[in-house]
């Protein structure tokens, strides 16, 4: 949903995924490369998934690390923390106008995001207002995910249903 939140709806997606047994009963979608085009403007994205079982990652959860990089015409924004803290960097880094700014003063624990999301949803119901992620956007995020899975299985580009 961060992809849609930052850059808007996705038009089409292409995924290259190696599916193999991981352990006794689960399948892994790693390694993988997923690319997509947003519906508005010249906005493209990619998501690389790599299995690195021997890589030490600081985390209070599971040994995975995710981050987001958004490159625009005037700068780059990095969100360096989701479930892990591989880089030990500020959670938000902005490179713009020849300067790099690091933003540290924020709650970044992965578990806190679920608590804040649940509180936001409850307040929206009680207060009668729309939460940040509405039903239409949630359905689009699901459609994007399903299209990526279909693309990986069928080995072709897939349009994301509106």
Enumerate the predicted regions with their spans.
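A short alpha-helix capping/helix-coil boundary motif
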Residues: 98-101, 126-128
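Contiguous beta-strand/loop segments that form the cofactor/metal-binding neighborhood of enzyme cores
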Residues: 1-84, 111, 115-127, 161
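Short secondary-structure transition/capping segments
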Residues: 25-26, 91, 145-146
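C-terminal helix-rich "cap/oligomerization" subdomain common to oxidoreductases
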Residues: 120-162
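C-terminal "lid/loop" region of Rossmann-like NAD(P)-dependent oxidoreductases
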Residues: 101-109
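Short polybasic amphipathic segments
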Residues: 68, 84-99
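A short, ordered amphipathic alpha-helix with a cationic face
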Residues: 109-111, 136
């Amino acid at each position: 949903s961060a992809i849609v939140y930052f850059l808007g709806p996705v038009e089409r997606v292409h995924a290259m995924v190696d599916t193999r047994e991981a352990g006794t009963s689960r399948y892994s979608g790693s390694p993988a490369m997923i690319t997509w085009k947003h519906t508005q403007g010249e906005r493209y994205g990619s998501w690389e998934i790599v299995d690195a079982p021997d890589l030490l990652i600081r985390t209070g959860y599971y040994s995975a690390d995710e981050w987001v990089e958004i490159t625009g015409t005037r700068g780059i924004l990095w969100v360096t923390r989701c479930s892990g803290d591989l880089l030990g960097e500020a959670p938000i880094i902005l490179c713009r106008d020849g300067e790099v700014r690091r933003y540290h003063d924020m709650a970044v624990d992965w578990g806190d995001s679920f608590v804040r999301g649940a509180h936001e949803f409850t307040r929206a119901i009680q207060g009668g207002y729309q939460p940040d992620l509405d039903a239409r956007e949630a359905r689009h995020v699901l459609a994007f995910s399903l299209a990526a899975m279909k693309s990986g299985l069928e080995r072709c580009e897939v349009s994301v249903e509106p």
